[in-house]
Design a protein with these regions (language model features):
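AAA+ P-loop NTPase nucleotide-binding core of proteostasis motors
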Residues: 1-35, 44-86, 91, 96-149, ...
Length: 426
């Protein structure tokens, strides 16, 4: 029996059982590719990819020049002000971080690598309580920008050997957000949410139950944050030695990590108290007996506080910009209910307007919604849900008639599920 088979591409005959001469062979269909053809195909693909990347680089450069004129820090903040109440310092920090990211990209495109003075990335860590606007800030920022942006839940990440997602999934998410354009992906932004959930057990914070792999996850993220080549398989493909892989360099990807960091204010207070008692040989400090408020403490976060919380020093060194968000008080929640373009009250008014209904909320009702959110300790996150709970029956019944009506939501509706006041206006 002839031990050779014809290559389906070049028609050259090669030995069937030689993996070196015949790396691709399907005995069922008879399809075969010899080693020479496989090499030629890979070279052709690589040459094509080089041309594609050149075109993508030229397009990215062209877009950068246009983008630089509209993403000045003050313009980014003005845009965020339309949707996010308070958090002015955080808006400034993120606006500058994003603008500098664009400048760093432009500098890289304008100069050859051997001409470059190194401008290091200014990755950002965001701290703030649940519902204070961390995710909202970044989602609106992403809408404004013309660069890929992807969010990954850090709590789902595990180090090799544990069940869960490998850290490479963060880059893979960005790759797909960039429509599989590697050049755009390599200049995008990754947001690692719930970053506090991967704090190590040895930290002073006892409110979390960390898995043994959490410090390992942080170690796995180190090179990615600094800049390295990350290799991953396409979505839906199992990881095995023969699977084709995609390579992305993270050198120019901006990383933003964020979380509630529950309990870090206690670490900060402890540090400040230790410092205060050492001043003036134990002299009493004015207001020393008063319990510091969260908002007074969180803005004083330092790298050593994050280390005591359970973030390893090497990670902190790669997150030079600390951005803190304040807890929202009742006045801030009231403004969030009514002022931004996407304010819950404005949304429901528009929805009811489409059913020929004038929707009104009494001042007491708005205060009741804000107070309920504070009681739940969920910040702005629960505002829409509280209103939705009250509005459900009205939104179900109102479409039964086309009459022009007015619906008034009172504090009694919010607190006791009383029926809203409905008046005919015809």
């Amino acid at each position: 029996k002839d031990p050779t088979i014809q290559c389906s591409f070049c028609k050259r005959r090669v030995v069937v059982h030689s993996q070196y001469d015949l790396p691709v062979y399907d005995p069922r269909s008879g399809f075969a590719l010899c080693a020479r053809c496989v090499t030629d195909i890979y070279k052709a693909i690589e040459a094509h990819q080089v041309e594609v990347n050149k075109e993508a680089d030229a397009e990215t450069m062209s877009n950068l020049d246009e983008e630089m004129s509209r993403i000045k820090p003050h313009l980014i903040k003005e845009y965020l002000d339309k949707y996010i109440i308070n958090q002015d310092q955080a808006k400034k920090i993120l606006s500058v971080a994003v603008y500098n990211h664009y400048k760093r990209m432009k500098y890289g495109f304008d100069h050859k690598e051997d001409e470059l003075d190194e401008i290091e990335k200014s990755n950002v860590i965001i701290l703030g309580p649940s519902g204070c606007g961390k995710t909202a800030l970044l989602s609106h920022l992403a809408k404004m920008l013309d660069i890929p942006f992807a969010v990954t839940d850090s709590s789902s990440l595990t180090e090799a050997g544990f069940v869960g997602s490998d850290v490479e999934v963060a880059v893979r998410n960005l790759y797909y957000a960039a429509d599989k354009n590697i050049t755009r992906c390599e200049h995008g932004i990754i947001y690692l949410d719930e970053f506090d959930k991967i704090a190590r057990k040895s930290g002073e914070n006892n409110t979390i139950t960390a898995d043994p792999g959490h410090e390992g996850v942080q170690q796995s993220l180190l090179k990615m944050l600094e800049g390295s080549e990350v290799e991953f398989t396409a979505r839906g493909q199992r990881k095995h030695p023969e699977a084709p892989t995609i390579k992305v360099n993270t050198k120019n990807i901006l990383f933003i990590v964020g979380g509630a960091f529950v309990g870090i204010e206690k670490i900060i207070a402890k540090r400040l108290k230790a410092t205060d008692t050492g001043i003036g040989f134990g002299a009493k400090i004015e207001g020393q007996n008063e319990k510091p408020k969260y908002n007074d403490l969180i803005h004083k976060t330092r790298p050593e506080d994050l280390m005591k919380f359970g973030i390893i020093p090497e990670i902190i060194g790669r997150l030079p910009v600390i951005c803190t968000l304040e807890d929202l008080d009742e006045n801030a929640l009231l403004r969030i209910l009514t002022e931004p373009r996407n304010a819950p009250v404005r949304q429901y008014k528009k929805l009811m307007e489409m059913d020929n209904v004038d929707l009104e909320f009494s001042d007491d009702a708005l205060h009741a919604v804000a107070q309920k959110a504070i009681e739940r300790k969920t910040g702005a996150r629960s505002l829409k849900g509280i209103i939705e709970d009250v509005m459900l029956d009205i939104m179900f019944d109102i479409p039964k008639s086309d009459k022009h009506r007015k619906v008034t939501i009172t504090a009694d509706c919010i607190n006791n599920h009383a029926t809203p006041i409905v008046e005919d206006l015809e």
